[in-house]
Each structure stands twice: as structure tokens, then as C-alpha cells.
A protein has these predicted regions:
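Core beta-strand elements of the Rossmann-like FAD/NAD(P) dinucleotide-binding domain
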Residues: 7-10, 176-185, 365
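N-terminal Rossmann-like FAD-binding beta1-loop-alpha1 element of flavoenzymes
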Residues: 12-37
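Conserved N-terminal glycine-rich FAD pyrophosphate-binding loop of Rossmann-like flavoproteins
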Residues: 41-66, 243
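An anion/pyrophosphate-binding glycine-rich loop and adjacent beta-alpha core
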Residues: 43, 213, 220-336, 394, ...
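Glycine-rich active-site loop/strand segments that organize a redox cofactor
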Residues: 57-89
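Conserved redox-cofactor binding core of oxidoreductases
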Residues: 94-177, 185, 189-190, 198, ...
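Glycine-rich loop(s) and the adjacent beta-strand/alpha-helix scaffold that form part
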Residues: 185-240, 383-403
Length: 542
């Protein structure tokens, strides 16, 4: 184990430097709070700034008359899986938080068309952001010029430390050594977990470390089975977001051998299927067009490297804003013409609708520990409306800092650095006897393959159980003290995903069980927590 060479102290520790983390940091700095920002890469990284997409939207409540309509749209796709108090907080605050994007270097604009967001039934204001490189440069300049913010780049969260149910600090790894950070409040903004999948639309380091450390610290996870899978390009270039709206002009889908995957449908039925699927991005079993994603994954399981889509020339004749932004970006930045190039797609892991359980202030079950952005389970449920992800990051990062300021004023940490060091050393002792027979690279590669095939759009008991057994074997043969904590956290979160998917024996929203294809009339959420030292999943009936 590396030595503890550094000790730092702050009012608020922010872990993560995407949109949620940066908003938390600048809002804390505005309150005069000494803030440390820890991130695995550089400031302004993570999924927020991933360049494999043209733009991001932020959907906000459009006046008092829209309040109940928006709430209904959210409820329609949440399917009883979300928290009404958190939804109300978003509906109230979202119109007033767009300016927070300017504070971290973006230049948002209001979209000009009246197209409803993905899954939404009603149109409302949608603000857009893009220009990821410029926004990243701006954010780094903003953080670098703040007298209240200290960045810890290329650093990883290893352990969250608590005392009597309150946050006291964390252990960070930087350059092979450990750093103790004592704080009065902590904001987790570590993002999602899509990097656990072989094909994903995220940077390569999002393994769910925030989820794993929060769970060990006493937090609960909820809705972890609900992961969004969005078609992404595997050719002509890999890991590029596919614009689902282009399916309106799709003329066919074939596997690698050229077999028509909808040969059993009439031409009019195929056309209707593509049109319906063009209205939403993430897979959902709530629509008849679910067979688009299911047959795509069946072809992949049978050996196809994605499926090929063909398009009519009228695709490029549609110059409405939603089409023009994507198609122009695709040609300009990626050199792809969807009517000329061979377009092959597969289901890519994207956002996690579940995460750390929070209240309407972003606070977890641990006092003073907050979770914001994708690491949290916010307004999402079984699925999420387009444009609510970034909006949720803005609303709850701001709310978290407002509440964190009270801990700065009220809470004096009674735990010394020496006590924190002893706690960490005692925790590490559990790994000393493990004889590590596999490396982090081997573990992560295996995890990604297991989840890609067994915990994707298609799920069933046998494949999930077999994958879980393999994860147990890997965990028993891996020592984080020898090969690092990334793979340790990845294994922990992958096991949570498998258990949650096994536990929900029904199909709902983003979760499809081929062996349980219908929805259960009973509505419940699955809560994951440690109880008496063991991982436990209980049902919280709504």
C-alpha cells in the first residue's frame, strides 16, 4: 500500500469535474467556501464533455401552465420508479438555472423548433449546448482563476470516511500515493458507469467508483437496473452517437450476413416501426418498436458486429433544426454521410437512470454527503425524458451547495487526520490476504464483455446468473492493493447491476427480461444497501 504523504482540508470536497461537479464548485466558491475538486482526468471532462455527440439539450418548465404537463410527461416514462419530491424540485427550479451553464463556460441557446423532447408528449423550452473544446477551455480558465478552488487532477476517490453517520473526509489516490482530505461537506459528481460495457458512449474511466464508495460509506442505491442503451455507430467510425430521429427515413436493417431482420413484416409495418423508433433515443420496452433493439441485440449475440441501416435520400432534404444540427455535425466533424457510407449500429451503454438515493437537496443517507449528476438517482425512473439529465445536474448541484453551506457553518470535524489514517489502514487490511491472480486490465476487459452480452437490452435469468458467478470468481482473485481500486470498484458495481437485474422479474421502461416480458402490476423500487456487512436488495413498494 502506498504511503499517505499529504493531508488537506476544505469546506467542501467535490469529486468529479463534469457539468455537475463544476457547477457545485463555482457555487461553493461564490459562497466563499474553500473547495477542493478531485477528478480522474482534467477539469471539464467526463461524459459531459465527451465529443462523440453534436449537442446536449436541457428541458425546463415553461411557465405555471406547464407544471402539471411536465410532471405528467416525467411520470409517464418513470413508471412509478421516481421520487415526487425530487421531481417537484426540478420543475420549480429548472427554468432559473440555465445561467449556471454560463458560469462554467458554456453558451446555451434556446432551440428554435417546437419538437417535444425524447419521450415527452408536450413541447416546452429546450436549451442547447455544444462546442465541447471551447467549453472545456473556458471551464479550466474559470476554475484556475478562482481563489477558493483547488483542483486535484488525475486523482481518484478510494474511500469515503464517516463518523457517526456524518461525512468527515475521503482518501484520494494521486500519482500512486494516498492523500487524506478532511471536509465539512462532500459532493459526489463522479458520473455514471457506462465504461463497464464494451460498447459505450462515455470516456473510458467511468466505472462507477462514486457508486461503490458511497455504498460502502452507508448510502443506498436505487433503480440500478435501469440503464439507457442508445444505438451508436460501430462503422464507419466507432463510438459516435447515432441520431435516432434519422430512423424516420430508414429503409432497412440487416445483419452481417445481409439478412433482413424485419423480413416477417410488411413494408408498411416496417416503415411504421422505424417511424415510431425515430421518436426516442434510449431503448424502452414500453413501445411496440422495442423489437428494433431486441432484434439488433439478437443479431449481435448470433455473431454480427452490429447491424446495417440504409436510408433514403430524402433524409438530407429535411433541414429542420433537429436534423440539420446532427447531420451537419456528422459530416463536418466525423466525415460521415449516412446515405453514402455503410452505417452499422449497436446498443451502446449510455446514462444510468438509477444511482445513489438522494433527497430534494441532493443529500444522501450520510449527513453532509451529497450526490449530483448521473451518479445520483434524481428525477429519473424506469426511463428519462430527453433534456432532463443536464438540467438535473444544474438544479441539484445548486441545491446541494446551498445545503452544504449549513454544514460549513455548523459542523466542526472532530476526527483527526491520524484517526482517518488508521481507519484507512484498517480497511485496507481486508485485502492483504488476497493472492491476486489477475490484473486490472484483465478484470475490466472481462467485466465489459460480460455486461455487454448479458446485461444489455436482452436479459434473462440464466445469463445474468452465470455472469454474476464469473464476477464473484474475479473478485476473489483480485487485490486492489496490488493492481489498483478501479477494477475493485468496477466489480462491486457490476455485481450490483446483476443483482438488480435478476431481482426485477418483469419488464419495465429500460429494463427488459426476455423471460419476464410483461410488467408486474405491483410497483416497487429496489433499494441496494449494506446490512450487517452483506449486500442486500429490498423492495420499496410504491
Amino acid at each position: 500500500m502506498g504511503a499517505i504523504l499529504e493531508r488537506s482540508e476544505c469546506d467542501v470536497l467535490v469529486v468529479g469535474a463534469g457539468i455537475a461537479g463544476l457547477v457545485a464548485a463555482v457555487q461553493a466558491a461564490d459562497r466563499g467556501m474553500k473547495t477542493i475538486v478531485v477528478c480522474k482526468g482534467k477539469i471539464a471532462g467526463g461524459a459531459s464533455y465527451f465529443p462523440g455527440k453534436a449537442s446536449l439539450g436541457i428541458q425546463v418548465t415553461k411557465g405555471a401552465s406547464d407544471y402539471e404537463l411536465f410532471k405528467g410527461d416525467i411520470a409517464q416514462v418513470a413508471k412509478g420508479m421516481n421520487d415526487p419530491a425530487i421531481v417537484d424540485a426540478y420543475l420549480t427550479d429548472s427554468p432559473h438555472k440555465i445561467s449556471l451553464l454560463n458560469k462554467i463556460g458554456f453558451r446555451p441557446w434556446l432551440r428554435g423548433d417546437n419538437r417535444p423532447a425524447c419521450f415527452a408528449r408536450h413541447p416546452r423550452d429546450i436549451f442547447m449546448i455544444s462546442d465541447w473544446q471551447e467549453a472545456s477551455r473556458n471551464a479550466r480558465a474559470i476554475i484556475g482563476s478562482s481563489e477558493h478552488i483547488v483542483p486535484f487532477e488525475r486523482s481518484s476517490l478510494i474511500r469515503i470516511q464517516t463518523d457517526s453517520g456524518r461525512i468527515v473526509g475521503a482518501v484520494i489516490e494521486r500519482d500512486g500515493e494516498y492523500v487524506l482530505i478532511r471536509c465539512k461537506a462532500m459532493v459526489l459528481a463522479t458520473g455514471g458507469l457506462a465504461s463497464l460495457y464494451q460498447h459505450n458512449l462515455y470516456p473510458g474511466h467511468l466505472y462507477g467508483g462514486g457508486h461503490a464508495t458511497a455504498l460502502e460509506a452507508g448510502c443506498q442505491l436505487v433503480n440500478m437496473e435501469y440503464i439507457q442503451f442508445i444505438p451508436g455507430l460501430v462503422a464507419p467510425k466507432n463510438k459516435v452517437l447515432f441520431g435516432e430521429h434519422t430512423l424516420k427515413y430508414c429503409t432497412g436493417m440487416v445483419d452481417q450476413q445481409g439478412r433482413d431482420l424485419f423480413a416477417d413484416l410488411s413494408p408498411s409495418a416496417s416503415e411504421a416501426l422505424f417511424v415510431e423508433r425515430s421518436a426516442y433515443a434510449p431503448f424502452s420496452c414500453d413501445y411496440a418498436s422495442q423489437i428494433f433493439d431486441i432484434r439488433m441485440m439478437e443479431a449481435i449475440r448470433a455473431g454480427s458486429d452490429g447491424v446495417r441501416l440504409t436510408f433514403g435520400a430524402n433524409l438530407y432534404e429535411d433541414r429542420s433544426e433537429f436534423y440539420a444540427i446532427y447531420l451537419d455535425w456528422l459530416k463536418r466533424e466525423r466525415g460521415i454521410d449516412m446515405c453514402v457510407d455503410e452505417i452499422r449500429v449497436a446498443p451502446f451503454a449510455h446514462s444510468c437512470n438509477g444511482g445513489i438515493r438522494i433527497d430534494e437537496h441532493g443529500e444522501t443517507a450520510v449527513a453532509g454527503l451529497f450526490a449530483v449528476g448521473e451518479v445520483s438517482s434524481a428525477i429519473e425512473g424506469a426511463n428519462r425524458l430527453g433534456g432532463n439529465s443536464v438540467g438535473g445536474a444544474l438544479v441539484f448541484a445548486d441545491r446541494a451547495i446551498e445545503k452544504a453551506a449549513h454544514y460549513r457553518d455548523l459542523h466542526e470535524c472532530s476526527v483527526s487526520f491520524d484517526e482517518m489514517a488508521r481507519d484507512f489502514q484498517s480497511w485496507c487490511a481486508q485485502f492483504a490476504a488476497i493472492e491476486s491472480t489477475c490484473t486490472a486490465t484483465e478484470v475490466l476487459k472481462t467485466v465489459r464483455q460480460l455486461l455487454w452480452i448479458n446485461a444489455n437490452v436482452l436479459r434473462e435469468h440464466r445469463s445474468l446468473s452465470d455472469a454474476l458467478a464469473r464476477l464473484d470468481e474475479l473478485e476473489a482473485a483480485y487485490s486492489p492493493l496490488v493492481h489498483g481500486f478501479d477494477a475493485y470498484h468496477a466489480l462491486a458495481v457490476a455485481k450490483v447491476l446483476m443483482l438488480a437485474m435478476l431481482g426485477r422479474r418483469e419488464s419495465r421502461g429500460a429494463h427488459f427480461r426476455a423471460d419476464y416480458p410483461n410488467a408486474d402490476p405491483r410497483v416497487y423500487r429496489q433499494i441496494v444497501a449494506f446490512h450487517a456487512g452483506a449486500l442486500e436488495i429490498r423492495r420499496d413498494h410504491q
